[in-house]
């Protein structure tokens, strides 16, 4: 009887222990499941609802970046992103950025990215390339600097210093005076954090690519060097925005060059005055400069703007026969009238002047009404 009571008491005493152990196991199971679930979610599950682009600047810390990402309204679970950032050493327990862990750059977050992928992307600098577009009129170095700096992390001063750095430019075969020829307007795939050296490398590669064996032969046939092609092309580029006319304009200037005539190109006068003139007058033609093609025969010492491929192709493939002159069309549509003789040129010039006078009178009458 006493043995049965002892056994019963033992069972009674062991029951709470079993319950405790079982409860601990259940809690541990659910805790492991909870932690494991969070780890799985952080590493494997998409935590973003849409695509977004972010730019990380050198002076930004991870809190700034976190705020930038959250502002895009694409984060499903902020806690998941914070955990991933902390695990990758980007975020400490006090929400302070990890030292030297965050990589500046342009990043793209997509809807299939996990929190861990984004954290590693930021830590390892897995940037998305950007398209740097160089287009339009570029008559000043400051314009080139502004166009590049607006699309890259570098500032305009960095670009300007490079365009003035003769030692740097000499590595590419150019000088600060003729650097316009180095730039080839186009769309380039670059990384937002690329240095100015990388940009210049790409320009030189594009420049070299243009100068095929066939184009070199065409230049020699015109009696021009590569730089002289760029120089004449820059004048053509400044003369008109109507690309189909480029070969005709180039033809006129080449004819004048071959006959020993002065180019008398208005854009070279504009260049002498840093393109600040609204209208070129006779007094402006007396400006003493090697770039003044009214005063000096031949080509200017260097390009007066970034010429571009269309104008360079026009110089290599001119049209227009024996034309030696051209003037603006009286239709005011941006085109020109071409002539082989001075007398025909005067007729065209008078027609334009007559149309211009009539246009100005009409404008004055409208203002009076």
What would you call each of these model-derived segments?
Residues 2-5, 32, 231, 253:
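A general, composition-driven signal for non-globular sequence regions
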């Amino acid at each position: 009887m006493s043995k049965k009571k002892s056994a019963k008491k033992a069972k009674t005493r062991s029951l709470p222990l079993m319950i405790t152990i079982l409860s601990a196991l259940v809690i541990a199971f659910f805790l492991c499941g909870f932690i494991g679930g969070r780890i799985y979610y952080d590493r494997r599950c998409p935590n973003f609802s849409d695509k977004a682009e972010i730019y990380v600047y050198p002076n930004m810390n991870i809190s700034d970046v976190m705020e930038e990402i959250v502002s895009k309204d694409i984060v499903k679970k902020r806690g998941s992103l914070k955990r991933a950032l902390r695990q990758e050493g980007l975020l400490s327990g006090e929400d302070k950025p990890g030292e030297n862990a965050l990589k500046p750059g342009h990043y793209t977050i997509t809807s299939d990215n996990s929190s861990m992928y984004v954290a590693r992307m930021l830590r390892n600098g897995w940037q998305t390339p950007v398209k740097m577009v160089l287009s339009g009129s570029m008559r000043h170095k400051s314009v080139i600097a502004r166009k590049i700096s607006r699309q890259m992390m570098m500032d305009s001063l960095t670009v300007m210093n490079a365009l003035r750095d003769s030692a740097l430019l000499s590595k590419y075969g150019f000088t600060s005076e003729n650097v316009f020829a180095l730039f080839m307007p186009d769309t380039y795939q670059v990384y937002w954090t690329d240095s100015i050296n990388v940009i210049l490398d790409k320009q030189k590669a594009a420049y070299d690519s243009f100068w095929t064996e066939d184009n070199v032969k065409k230049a020699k046939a015109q009696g021009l060097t590569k730089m002289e092609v760029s120089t004449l092309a820059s004048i053509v580029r400044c003369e008109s925005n109507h690309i189909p006319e480029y070969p005709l304009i180039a033809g006129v200037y080449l004819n004048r060059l071959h006959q020993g005539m002065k180019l008398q190109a208005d854009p070279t006068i504009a260049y002498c005055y840093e393109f600040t003139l609204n209208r070129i007058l006779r007094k402006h033609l007396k400006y003493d400069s090697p770039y003044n093609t009214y005063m000096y025969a031949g080509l200017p010492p260097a390009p007066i703007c970034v010429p571009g491929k269309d104008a360079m192709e026009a110089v290599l493939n001119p049209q227009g026969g024996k034309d030696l002159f051209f003037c603006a069309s009286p239709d005011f549509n941006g085109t020109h009238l071409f002539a082989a003789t001075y007398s025909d040129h005067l007729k065209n010039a008078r027609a334009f002047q007559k149309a211009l006078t009539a246009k100005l009178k009409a404008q004055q009458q409208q203002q009076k009404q």
